Amino acid sequence: MPMQGAQRRLLGSLNSTPTATPNLGLAANHTGAPCLEVSIPHGLFLSLGLVSLVENVLVVAAIAKNRNLHSPMYCFICCLALSDLLVSGSNMLETAVILLLEAGALATRASVVQQLQNTIDVLTCSSMLCSLCFLGAIAVDRYVSIFYALRYHSIVTLPRARRAIAAIWVASVLSSTLFIAYCDHAAVLLCLVVFFLAMLVLMAVLYVHMLARACQHAQGITRLHKRQLPAHQGFGLRGAATLTILLGIFFLCWGPFFLHLMLVVLCPQHLTCSCIFKNFKVFLTLIICNTIIDPLIYAFRSQELCRTLKEVLLCSW
């Protein structure tokens, strides 16, 4: 990940020895003041990564199998699953290598570990950027399908979707390579934070606008059928609750990680910030949790995809 030297975990593992860590403890900073440090067990981290890996592999397999799902919307969902798969897979790979280094089962030179670290960092960073981009792309696709319903199939065509997907992957890989190469520069970390905030604002604006249009549509139906207003109010409350959950999960899972990046720039030596830095793996775990939740929100709610998924599972048995 694009962190300063303190977060280069693979290199640090070369000279480390296996130690037992509690699940929750107080770590002291350099002044002796206690810091709340939450230690995520490697087993839990790997288990969450494995769940994410299996979920997203199933989504990709189901979409690839069913030609009816080869539409622009499902292409974006498939790419989101693929990028989430790479997020969890790269973090699992890094954790596995750390465990092997700490156990002495993997003996190698520091230069080799540095190259491996850089490769994993680029893979992780590019997959995270892709994941954020495809979340934004799905929001844009849904927005166009609602506000330009009659022209949707002429606006969002499969060739355009493929070009957008290719552009996102290429831009993410190139950007992450530059980010890792210049990760010690504050401007790089600020760019990542600004990018996250831009995606958050984009999704919030689009989904709020879509909710407002849906409420207007429900109100029109209510007037047409002369139903009472509470039915419309109930629809608005359900829509607001769904929107709150959608954006809340996105912010809670991704926000702490980008807050960490921002604090690295703003207060790298501050005592409170130093305490927050100690919980870096917690922030990564939240991102892994988001890769588990994404298929539940964007993929498994589709009946067509779920039917195909059952076929894939039955064929595998």
UniProtKB/Swiss-Prot annotation:
Major location (coarse): membrane
GO biological process: one example: adenylate cyclase-activating G protein-coupled receptor signaling pathway
Any single GO CC term annotated in Swiss-Prot or TrEMBL for this entry: plasma membrane
Sorted UniProt keywords: Cell membrane, G-protein coupled receptor, Glycoprotein, Lipoprotein, Membrane, Palmitate, Receptor, Transducer, Transmembrane, Transmembrane helix
Positions in the Extracellular compartment: 1-37, 94-118, 184-191, 267-279
Glycan attachment sites: 29
Ranges per topology, Cytoplasmic: 64-72, 141-163, 212-240, 301-317
Compartments it resides in: Cell membrane
Molecular functions per Gene Ontology: melanocyte-stimulating hormone receptor activity
UniProt xrefs under SMART domains: 7TM_GPCR_Srsx
Topology in the lipid bilayer: Multi-pass membrane protein
Protein origin, superkingdom: Eukaryota
Name of one Pfam family that matches: 7tm_1
Membrane-spanning residues: 38-63, 73-93, 119-140, 164-183, 192-211, 241-266, 280-300
InterPro entries tied to this protein: GPCR_Rhodpsn (IPR000276), GPCR_Rhodpsn_7TM (IPR017452), Melcrt_ACTH_rcpt (IPR001671), MSH_rcpt (IPR000761)
Lipidation (S-palmitoyl cysteine): 315
Subunit structure: Interacts with MGRN1, but does not undergo MGRN1-mediated ubiquitination; this interaction competes with GNAS-binding and thus inhibits agonist-induced cAMP production. Interacts with OPN3; the interaction results in a decrease in MC1R-mediated cAMP signaling and ultimately a decrease in melanin production in melanocytes.
Family named by the database record: Belongs to the G-protein coupled receptor 1 family.
Record's function text: Receptor for MSH (alpha, beta and gamma) and ACTH. The activity of this receptor is mediated by G proteins which activate adenylate cyclase. Mediates melanogenesis, the production of eumelanin (black/brown) and phaeomelanin (red/yellow), via regulation of cAMP signaling in melanocytes.
Name of the protein in its database record: Melanocyte-stimulating hormone receptor
